[in-house]
Amino acid sequence: MSSTRVLVLNSGSSSVKYQLIDMRDGERLAAGLVERIGERTSRLRHTLVAAGDTREQEGPIADHEAALKAVAAELGRDGLGLDSPELAAIGHRVVHGGEFFSEPTLIDENVLTEIERLIPVAPLHNPANLTGIRTAQALRPDLPQVAVFDTAFHTTMPESAARYAIDPKIADRYRIRRYGFHGTSHAYVSRETARLLGRAPGDVNVIVLHLGNGASASAVRGGRCVDTSMGLTPLEGLVMGTRSGDMDPAVIFHLMRVGGMSADEIDTLLNKRSGLFGLCGDNDMREIRRRVDEDDEQAGLAFDIYIHRLKKYIGAYYAVLGRVDAVAFTAGVGENSAPVREAAVAGLEGLGLAVDGGLNAVRGDGARLISPAGARVAVAVVPTDEEMEIATQTYALVSESGNPDLT
């Protein structure tokens, strides 16, 4: 029997998201989420996609091992268990791969060691990713396990974009450079944008705007990232739901010296109490837009600051690329907020950017153009699909490895 299924795992600090995908036709067989791991009120939500059948269970799930065993049991109830000969591999989302991992990688002890070494630059994510990998390995030690890194797509950035202007000895000692994040999404969306235009990815220059609670922009030339807005951490760049984005670093010294704040307090301020939330008390763009429509000044200023930063990055990446074929909006805000898309390109007609009001207002599930007919630069809404991208990269890698069970 051929093995064509890939289980995609995204292990967070207290959650596990998963999808089981058949790579013959891209069909999603099952999907689910285990949340509040380690609490008495843990919950597992499992969906058999084709049947539209969703099951939920609540109760204590002690750790990631128990969570994955519960996932395996739910899949087994549907005849899709981890012991199925049709399961080709497990693909793991790993947030930080540093400068070492530029492509999906078969996991062995050396890979695990390197992911562990990167914990200081990804303390919130890599430990949970490691736990998920080790738990999955314990459940299926014979099955190929593949790491797909959020940072990998950005390793093609030139040194002029990846380096900070500080002493290189210090930068190298502490691994300080611009890694970028959301790379799996940027890779998928840039490729799908080229498909939407009917062109090969290698022929297209795209500015991708991944706008969710976390937000990032990337400049993609011919399918390769040449710049991105996030840096050493996801704090750099665009204004986000709770993160400040770009800011004068001296603000930190000022808060320490004058405000008496500790490094941890400032970390919390900039990552969890800033951005849209810090400006107006809301990080949900829908609520912010409702308040804007009611002439709420705080919400209006927050929206204007958000859009101002977005415009700056669009302009900067236009300059970096030299020629832009498309600007693609993706993720929760990018896919669903017509006002954000309209405001982001307003006044940029000189760069060939505009949206058609009617097309922009239409809600849809698939990739679509929202620029006027004949526009010099296409403006598109392209739903991201990180799970499919992880599955695709995982299956391609294990297929190349020569497994005779794969077709």
Swiss-Prot record:
<dbReference type="GO" id="GO:0006085">
    <property type="term" value="P:acetyl-CoA biosynthetic process"/>
</dbReference>
<dbReference type="GO" id="GO:0000287">
    <property type="term" value="F:magnesium ion binding"/>
</dbReference>
<feature type="binding site">
    <location>
        <position position="17"/>
    </location>
    <ligand>
        <name>ATP</name>
    </ligand>
</feature>
<keyword id="KW-0479">Metal-binding</keyword>
<dbReference type="GO" id="GO:0006083">
    <property type="term" value="P:acetate metabolic process"/>
</dbReference>
<comment type="pathway">
    <text>Metabolic intermediate biosynthesis; acetyl-CoA biosynthesis; acetyl-CoA from acetate: step 1/2.</text>
</comment>
<comment type="function">
    <text>Catalyzes the formation of acetyl phosphate from acetate and ATP. Can also catalyze the reverse reaction.</text>
</comment>
<dbReference type="InterPro" id="IPR004372">
    <property type="entry name" value="Ac/propionate_kinase"/>
</dbReference>
<feature type="binding site">
    <location>
        <begin position="284"/>
        <end position="286"/>
    </location>
    <ligand>
        <name>ATP</name>
    </ligand>
</feature>
<keyword id="KW-0418">Kinase</keyword>
<keyword id="KW-0547">Nucleotide-binding</keyword>
<feature type="binding site">
    <location>
        <position position="93"/>
    </location>
    <ligand>
        <name>substrate</name>
    </ligand>
</feature>
<feature type="site" description="Transition state stabilizer">
    <location>
        <position position="243"/>
    </location>
</feature>
<keyword id="KW-0460">Magnesium</keyword>
<dbReference type="InterPro" id="IPR023865">
    <property type="entry name" value="Aliphatic_acid_kinase_CS"/>
</dbReference>
<feature type="active site" description="Proton donor/acceptor">
    <location>
        <position position="150"/>
    </location>
</feature>
<dbReference type="GO" id="GO:0005737">
    <property type="term" value="C:cytoplasm"/>
</dbReference>
<keyword id="KW-0808">Transferase</keyword>
<dbReference type="GO" id="GO:0008776">
    <property type="term" value="F:acetate kinase activity"/>
</dbReference>
<keyword id="KW-0067">ATP-binding</keyword>
<feature type="binding site">
    <location>
        <begin position="332"/>
        <end position="336"/>
    </location>
    <ligand>
        <name>ATP</name>
    </ligand>
</feature>
<comment type="subunit">
    <text>Homodimer.</text>
</comment>
<dbReference type="InterPro" id="IPR043129">
    <property type="entry name" value="ATPase_NBD"/>
</dbReference>
<dbReference type="InterPro" id="IPR000890">
    <property type="entry name" value="Aliphatic_acid_kin_short-chain"/>
</dbReference>
<feature type="binding site">
    <location>
        <begin position="210"/>
        <end position="214"/>
    </location>
    <ligand>
        <name>ATP</name>
    </ligand>
</feature>
<protein>
    <recommendedName>
        <fullName>Acetate kinase</fullName>
        <ecNumber>2.7.2.1</ecNumber>
    </recommendedName>
</protein>
<feature type="binding site">
    <location>
        <position position="10"/>
    </location>
    <ligand>
        <name>Mg(2+)</name>
    </ligand>
</feature>
<feature type="binding site">
    <location>
        <position position="386"/>
    </location>
    <ligand>
        <name>Mg(2+)</name>
    </ligand>
</feature>
<feature type="site" description="Transition state stabilizer">
    <location>
        <position position="182"/>
    </location>
</feature>
<dbReference type="Pfam" id="PF00871">
    <property type="entry name" value="Acetate_kinase"/>
</dbReference>
<keyword id="KW-0963">Cytoplasm</keyword>
<dbReference type="GO" id="GO:0005524">
    <property type="term" value="F:ATP binding"/>
</dbReference>
<comment type="similarity">
    <text>Belongs to the acetokinase family.</text>
</comment>
